[in-house]
Amino acid sequence: MPQLSGGGGGGDPELCATDEMIPFKDEGDPQKEKIFAEISHPEEEGDLADIKSSLVNESEIIPASNGHEVVGQTQSSQEPYHDKAREHPDDGKHPDGGLYNKGPSYSSYSGYIMMPNMNSDPYMSNGSLSPPIPRTSNKVPVVQPSHAVHPLTPLITYSDEHFSPGSHPSHIPSEVNPKQGMSRHPPAPEMPTFYPLSPGGVGQITPPLGWQGQPVYPITGGFRQAYPSSLSGDTSMSRFSHHMIPGPPGPHTTGIPHPAIVTPQVKQEHPHTDSDLMHVKPEHEQRKEQEPKRPHIKKPLNAFMLYMKEMRANVVAECTLKESAAINQILGRRWHALSREEQAKYYELARKERQLHMQLYPGWSARDNYGKKKKRKREKLQESTSGTGPRMTAAYI
């Protein structure tokens, strides 16, 4: 920062005070030169504002004029196909308050969903379908219209091909829908990329583009029946491509057999399982047959049992009771009423009975009779849960 050598206000009048800044111009920079020229000439600001407004007006007029010119050219070549559309000029108004009617209406391009000019619609955001491309210079922002993009590019079609002006198929007549205000083509085999929509199939196809914040109107009411009712389902389904509609059920398309084919296999499995069970039962019986059969050996009678066996008939004859519990109670009372000598007789008979039993069944034990039922239950449970029944029986034997 250059400073005065003498300090104060003396010296050359071109020099300024020490607390002021001197702007130095960078030579060779055209942008900075223009900025300094504007600072030095403020009277030119009004001219720049006029230039900006004229450029903006031209950018708004050019797309509209181009759109009307293209519409005029296409209407001249397609007048014989739109007599029906001219009869209903006011039917195309949408009940949404004119949201879709802002800007020019392209009624000559039939078969498509018409959308407004996105460049002049104030309701569309800057990030919508085809916003204008702003170009900025050094100072003045210039809005350049998209000349490379056709003004009818916001049109939405169901075709993969790009739309070009003048490519309307003139050999296909168009039909005008009085409710929706848009024209459409009947489905024809000459148009492989356009898919006809039947009233039953429209609800199953999702729209390719969803507008946020705008009401959605059903399309099913606008399509008329182009074919008889007996042939509408078959013809409309046959015109869809093979990748949109699944084929008939069968092993050649999905690899999964038909349910009518699966059920016989299940039915064939039931006899197989039954035969397995029938095959298991003989093995269980054979294993039991292989085991040595032990007959049920009754234990020898004691003194009281011998007394009951002898006196039971007398008690039944004396009393009219037929209940065994009541008879046993009577016999028990009489047994305790006997003297020692009378009871000793039955004790001697019981001793002889035990000796005879030991001679007939040597090595017999009363545990064999009492533990046999529990043993059988345990074997059945082990065989049902796991196949360890034979090993357990071998261990117990």
UniProtKB/Swiss-Prot annotation:
The keyword Kinase does not apply. Residues 1-60 are annotated as: CTNNB1-binding. There is a cross-link at K25, K267 (Glycyl lysine isopeptide (Lys-Gly) (interchain with G-Cter in SUMO)). GO terms for biological process: alpha-beta T cell differentiation; anatomical structure regression; animal organ regeneration; apoptotic process involved in blood vessel morphogenesis; apoptotic process involved in morphogenesis; B cell proliferation; BMP signaling pathway; branching involved in blood vessel morphogenesis. It is found in: Nucleus. Residues 38-102, 164-190, 266-296, 367-397 are annotated as: Disordered. Keywords: Activator, DNA-binding, Isopeptide bond, Nucleus, Phosphoprotein, Transcription, Transcription regulation, Ubl conjugation, Wnt signaling pathway. GO terms for cellular component: beta-catenin-TCF complex; chromatin; cytoplasm; nucleoplasm; nucleus; protein-DNA complex; RNA polymerase II transcription regulator complex; transcription regulator complex. The keyword Nucleus applies. The modification Phosphoserine is found at S130, S164. Residues 80-96, 267-294 have a biased composition (Basic and acidic residues). Residues 297-365 bind DNA. Proline-rich and acidic regions are implicated in the activation functions of RNA polymerase II transcription factors. PANTHER family: LYMPHOID ENHANCER-BINDING FACTOR 1 (PTHR10373:SF11), TRANSCRIPTION FACTOR 7 FAMILY MEMBER (PTHR10373). Belongs to the TCF/LEF family. This is Lymphoid enhancer-binding factor 1. It comes from Rattus norvegicus (Rat). The gene is Lef1.
